[in-house]
Amino acid sequence: MPMKGRFPIRRTLQYLSQGNVVFKDSVKVMTVNYNTHGELGEGARKFVFFNIPQIQYKNPWVQIMMFKNMTPSPFLRFYLDSGEQVLVDVETKSNKEIMEHIRKILGKNEETLREEEEEKKQLSHPANFGPRKYCLRECICEVEGQVPCPSLVPLPKEMRGKYKAALKADAQD
C-alpha cells in the first residue's frame, strides 16, 4: 500500500500491532459518538483518527460504528453479549486517557493476555500433531525425511507386519 494520505503510518502493520487494548470476549459492538468541530471533542477526534485502527486490528470480532455530529457531547458505548451497555464519557479527555480508561474497564488484563499467548505458543509448537484446528501438522508424514503415510505410498514389504509374520513362520518350518 502506498504511503499516501494523512498520516499513512497509521496503516502500517507495526503501528497497528502496537495497540494495547484487547477487549474481553463479552464485548461485541463499540459505538463512537463524536463531533467534528468544537474544543471539547478534540480527544475523541484524535482517538478515532489514531486509535480506532489499532483497536480494529487487535479486536477483529468487535463491530465498531462511528456516529459523527449527532450528539452534543462525545461518548463511547459498548454492547456486551449479555445485553448490557457500558457508556463511557470522553468529553475533555485526551486520546491516551480514553485508551487507558477503556483498557482498564473492558480490556483483558496483562495476566490473561500472557496466558493466551503462552497457550498459542504451545499449540503452534512444531512437535505437536493433531487436527488442523489445534496443531500445525496432522501427521508425522508431513515432516520432511519421515516415512510417508501408508495410505498415500505403500510401505516396503520389510516394514509390513504380515510380511514379517510370514518370514517368521517360514523360518520356523
Swiss-Prot record:
Keywords: Disease variant, Mitochondrion, Primary mitochondrial disease, Ribonucleoprotein, Ribosomal protein. It comes from the Eukaryota. The keyword Signal does not apply. It holds the Pfam family L51_S25_CI-B8. InterPro entries: Ribosomal_mL43/mS25/NADH_DH, Ribosomal_mS25/mL61, Thioredoxin-like_sf. GO terms for cellular component: mitochondrial inner membrane; mitochondrial small ribosomal subunit; mitochondrion. GO terms for molecular function: structural constituent of ribosome. SMART domains: L51_S25_CI-B8 (SM00916). It is found in: Mitochondrion. GO terms for biological process: mitochondrial translation. It is linked to Combined oxidative phosphorylation deficiency 50: An autosomal recessive, mitochondrial encephalomyopathy characterized by intrauterine growth retardation, poor overall growth, delayed psychomotor development, hypotonia, muscle weakness, progressive loss of ambulation, and mitochondrial oxidative phosphorylation deficiency in patient tissues. Brain imaging shows partial agenesis of the corpus callosum. Component of the mitochondrial small ribosomal subunit (mt-SSU). Mature mammalian 55S mitochondrial ribosomes consist of a small (28S) and a large (39S) subunit. The 28S small subunit contains a 12S ribosomal RNA (12S mt-rRNA) and 30 different proteins. The 39S large subunit contains a 16S rRNA (16S mt-rRNA), a copy of mitochondrial valine transfer RNA (mt-tRNA(Val)), which plays an integral structural role, and 52 different proteins. PANTHER family: MITOCHONDRIAL RIBOSOMAL PROTEIN S25, SMALL RIBOSOMAL SUBUNIT PROTEIN MS25. Belongs to the mitochondrion-specific ribosomal protein mS25 family. This is Small ribosomal subunit protein mS25. It comes from Homo sapiens.
